[in-house]
Amino acid sequence: TWMNELKPSLVIGESMGAVHAIRIKGVPHILISPSLNAPFVLGRLCWLALIPGVTHLLDRIYKPREGDRQKLHFTYDVLRKYVCHGKAALANSSRSGNDDFFFAFFGTRDHYRRTGIVSVRTWKKHFGTNYMMYSGTHFTEEEHIFDKVLPLIYKVLDIK
């Protein structure tokens, strides 16, 4: 597997990438704006993509803006698989008995927190109180990488 080949010391994930990162076992996890509820919302709404024109409309509405990471293509087949993906991630949570290190950063101005896609309450339910709120948005601004994320990486990896 790629884990055996690369032997990562740490995994970092942001937004939906945090859900992917949580599924990786045996390494510390640093997560930024983890969208823990997104797989379940997308999975429940997948039927909308069967309506002609909806996939195209959502692709236009949610096209990556400057600074966004990558496109999410809203097809039925893609969206319906998200529920299993979310369940697999949460099965690897602290609440489910995993003793990996998990830490999350949440921006106070994260527009996805208003929708429930990103939820501190969901984080606390599955991972406890190992998180930090910071004055930022959904995508971590550079200054927060330097003053919050990097120091935690150094601490987790015991780099002096």
Model-identified regions with their sequence ranges:
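Gly/Ala-rich beta-loop-alpha elbow adjacent to hydrolase catalytic centers
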Residues: V11-I22
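The alpha/beta-hydrolase serine catalytic core
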Residues: P28-I159
